[in-house]
Amino acid sequence: MPSPKRTKFRKQHRGRLKGIATRSNSICFGKFALQALEPAWITARQIEAGRRAITRYARRGGKLWIRIFPDKPITARPAETRMGSGKGSPEYWVAIAKPGKILYEIGGVSENVAEAAMKIAAYKMPIRTAFIGININ
C-alpha cells in the first residue's frame, strides 16, 4: 500500500471537501485518463486495487501513472472504547479527490484497451468517474 515515509505530524483534522480540483485536473503524462466527478476520500487500498486492475488488463503494454497519493492519515478508536482520552491512532491513509482530479493516466496503448482498463479500475473507486483522452471530448 502506498503511504508517506514520514510526516511532520501523525494526526490531521478531517477538513472539508469543498470546490473543484484546481491542480492535477488535466492530462500531463499519458494519452488517456480516469477523472473524478465527485468529492471523496480514496483509500490506499482502493488506489492499489485500481492500479492492479489496470496493469493486469493492459498486460505488458503501455505505461501507467498514478496521479493521486494517500497523504492524509485517518484515525480510528478501538472497538468498545469509552469516549474521551484523546484522538485514536492512525489506521489508514487516504488521498483527497475533488471533482476534476485525475486519478490515473495511461499511455502506449490503444483507446479501446485504455477505456476497458479504466472502466475496470472505475469499479474499484468509491466515486463516479469519467474516461477522458487528449483526442476525445
Curated annotation (Swiss-Prot):
The keyword ATP-binding does not apply. GO terms for molecular function: rRNA binding; structural constituent of ribosome. GO terms for cellular component: mitochondrial large ribosomal subunit; plastid. The keyword Ribosomal protein applies. Gene3D superfamilies: Ribosomal protein L10e/L16. It comes from the Eukaryota. It is found in: Plastid. PROSITE patterns: RIBOSOMAL_L16_1, RIBOSOMAL_L16_2. GO terms for biological process: mitochondrial translation. CDD domains: Ribosomal_L16_L10e. Keywords: Plastid, Ribonucleoprotein, Ribosomal protein. Belongs to the universal ribosomal protein uL16 family. Part of the 50S ribosomal subunit. This is Large ribosomal subunit protein uL16c. It comes from Aneura mirabilis. The lineage of its organism: Eukaryota, Viridiplantae, Streptophyta, Embryophyta, Marchantiophyta.
